[in-house]
Design a protein with these regions (language model features):
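N-terminal alpha-helical transmembrane segments of multi-pass membrane transport
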Residues: 1-106, 151, 158-162, 166, ...
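Hydrophobic alpha-helical transmembrane segments of multi-pass membrane proteins
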Residues: 8-13, 69-73, 133-144, 153, ...
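Transmembrane alpha-helical segments in integral membrane proteins
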Residues: 16-23, 75-80, 135-160, 294-313, ...
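Selective recognition of specific alpha-helical transmembrane segments in multi-pass small-molecule
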Residues: 68-82, 174-197, 296-299, 308, ...
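P-loop potassium selectivity filter motif centered on the GYG triad
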Residues: 90-135, 198-294, 347-422, 486-535, ...
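Hydrophobic, small-residue-rich membrane helices and short re-entrant helix-turn-helix hairpins
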Residues: 158-181, 302-326, 441-462, 555-568
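C-terminal catalytic subdomain
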Residues: 429-433, 438-442, 459-485, 489-490, ...
């Protein structure tokens, strides 16, 4: 099957699964019965009783925001302490020591913000207890927090002259119990059936099928002749005295499948293994790759249809979905085409395989041969369009233009589907901007879903839309003038700048993926990236809730012949233009110094 046909198939499967899931989520959040209600509703009610939650409470937007901040703050402190103390806690068969304070802060900020940036390798840094009780729990609740904030905004559109947006605690409970837990239970079982590990055994050491020789610098010696009896290594007839013979391999174990499932569906992205879903024990074959890849965008895509049903305007949900979907298709096409073509330099270095019957060719540097160009390119587009960040190939090895597209998808504010909940409420902020601009053009008061858009909503919408660019540009600008950051770059020149820009784009966009050549585990980078993640997560949440509170207090306006349609192709086009203009105007100078300079340098 050709690369493009595979990409089309992946997109088709995504749409087919997203529509029914969207209907299910709408029923759950509106309190309607579902096919799982008989089993899950008693569990939900028990949680309310134990935690003394008033399920009828209607919080103001400020109280809702305070609840979100307190809940996230408690999660930050708990996860921080859990990492510091893991060396003296149970569930640590490898006897791993506690994590350094700066890395613990970075990881805590990363996981409570749904970013899941990882400046460490999970299998060699964190205990099973920390992975399960710390990271996996945050994968669930950080995803649920984003969806809860989205539904607060939806209620703002629905309600009339009201100050209540529902209860954060009720929303959080329903999302976890009725949506995330059952969905991830099914996906976990599919992954285990496909070969992803799920156990509590300590790591194992196994014998290699064939020994290898490495130099003193740790590089594999090609064409080496190994004599195990005399323990000597010869290359081209000469003995390499400082070479080491490797006959065993460290194989990590642990509860990977359960964490992989929620890392994908919750757009978290933090891998159980250091190389994420490129690891054969985390993503062993084409079947698990399909499950994990579709899971990335499943809930973000479904929420578009949920939104349309909830506001009783399904065409509006479809319009928002189409704006996101068209951007994704174009981005995926650009990545797939440029990766399939490669570059002349990569061809000279032997990284571009020639097309033949057994394989499709293309830039295979940094990619797994079991996946190839199509699955790797599709995953790259999905994971950066969503604020997921998991990878099955190394983005640092992509061609300059493909790397720029992945970077731009994050820099747009993670609104091309984006994270669960946060992607859609971010896109709705852009929709408010688009409606305001269109209203100015025709000389009418801007309206959206029957509510007037006034200066108060505009100010907060601008803040929501600009939070990501501010976090990325300020963070990367400061890092560029700190001398120690240069030591973290694997490459110099334009590509080195791209590594740094990608890092801050990933953290500022709450994505978490990385150009693997960048070493982010330093005190300055751990602290600065942690602050960027917190800023880019919670400022838009506060802005979204402020907009929701204002809209809920307004009356509905009757639709007239002069009302701007927000469900037709023209509005979809306008929305895409607004998103791209803000992204282009904000980031073009930075992109010109990085991936664009590298691209033009490669063809000069």
């Amino acid at each position: 099957m050709s690369t493009m046909m595979q990409c089309v198939l992946y997109l088709a499967i995504l749409v087919v699964l997203a529509i029914p899931l969207g209907a299910y989520i709408k029923n759950v959040m509106s309190g309607e019965k579902t096919f799982l209600s008989k089993v899950l509703t008693p569990c939900e009610n028990l949680i309310y009783k134990v935690m003394r939650v008033d399920r009828e409470e209607q919080m103001t937007w400020k109280k809702y925001a305070v609840s979100v901040m307190i809940f996230s703050g408690i999660g930050l402190v708990f996860l921080f302490l859990l990492q510091l103390l893991q060396g003296v806690l149970p569930g640590n068969p490898q006897n791993l020591s506690g994590v350094k304070w700066d890395l613990a802060f970075n990881t805590s900020a990363s996981f409570i913000t749904n970013t899941n940036w990882q400046a460490y390798s999970g299998e060699s840094t964190l205990s099973y207890l920390t992975q399960a009780l710390g990271l996996t729990v945050q994968n669930f609740v950080s995803a649920a927090t984003g969806i809860a904030v989205l539904f607060a905004l939806i209620r703002g559109f629905i309600k009339v002259k009201s100050s209540g947006l529902g209860s954060f605690w009720v929303d959080l409970t329903r999302i976890v119990v009725h949506i995330l837990l059952p969905l991830n239970l099914v996906i976990s079982l599919l992954l285990v059936g496909g070969g992803v590990i799920q156990n509590l055994k300590s790591a194992e050491t196994v014998s290699l099928v064939e020994p290898i020789a490495v130099s003193a610098e740790g590089e594999i010696l090609e064409d080496a002749v190994i004599d195990l009896d005399t323990e000597t290594v010869t290359v081209d007839g000469e003995i390499v005295s400082d070479a080491q013979i490797v006959t065993e391999q460290f194989v990590p174990m642990g509860p990977a499948a359960s964490q992989v499932a929620i890392k994908q569906t919750g757009t978290n992205g933090g891998g159980y293994m250091g190389v994420n879903s490129a690891h054969p024990l985390e993503n062993p074959n084409a079947f698990t790759n399909l499950i994990e890849m579709i899971s990335i965008l499943l809930i973000p895509a479904a929420l578009c249809f949920t939104f349309g049903s909830a506001v009783k305007n399904k065409r509006q949900g479809i319009a928002i979905f189409m704006a996101m979907f068209l951007c994704l298709v174009v981005a995926l096409g650009c990545i797939a085409v440029t990766e399939q073509a490669g570059t002349s330099q990569l061809a000279q270095n032997g990284a571009v395989n020639m097309s033949m019957a057994e394989q499709a060719g293309g830039n295979m540097e940094g990619k797994e041969t079991r996946f190839g160009i199509a699955a790797s390119s599709t995953w790259a587009a999905f994971t950066t369009a969503a604020s997921n960040g998991s990878v099955n190939s190394m983005h640092d090895s992509y061609t300059p233009l493909a790397g720029m597209v992945t970077m731009l998808l994050m820099q747009l504010g993670e609104v091309i589907f984006g994270g669960v909940g946060c992607g859609l409420y971010g896109m709705l902020a852009f929709a408010i901007l688009a409606v305001f601009i269109a209203g100015l053009m025709v000389g009418r008061t801007p309206e959206f879903l029957g509510k007037k858009i006034e200066p108060y909503e505009m100010k907060w919408s601008v803040l929501v839309c600009l939070a990501t660019p501010i976090a990325i540009l300020v963070g990367s600008g400061l890092a560029a003038v700190v001398p120690s950051v240069m030591d973290s770059l694997h490459n110099g020149g334009a590509h080195g700048f791209s590594e740094m820009l990608y890092t801050y784009s990933s953290c500022g966009g709450n994505n978490g993926s990385a150009f693997a050549g960048f070493n982010g585990n330093t005190v300055f980078l751990n602290v600065s990236l942690g602050l960027v993640m917190l800023f880019a997560r919670f400022l838009p949440i506060i802005g979204t809730l402020a907009i929701a509170g204002s809209l809920a207090g307004k009356k509905k306006i009757a639709t007239t012949a002069g009302t701007l349609s927000t469900t037709n192709g023209m509005f979809v086009f306008l929305l895409i233009v607004v998103v791209l203009l803000i992204g282009a105007l904000s980031f073009f100078p930075a992109l010109a110094l990085g991936p664009l300079a590298e691209f033009f340098g490669s063809i000069a």
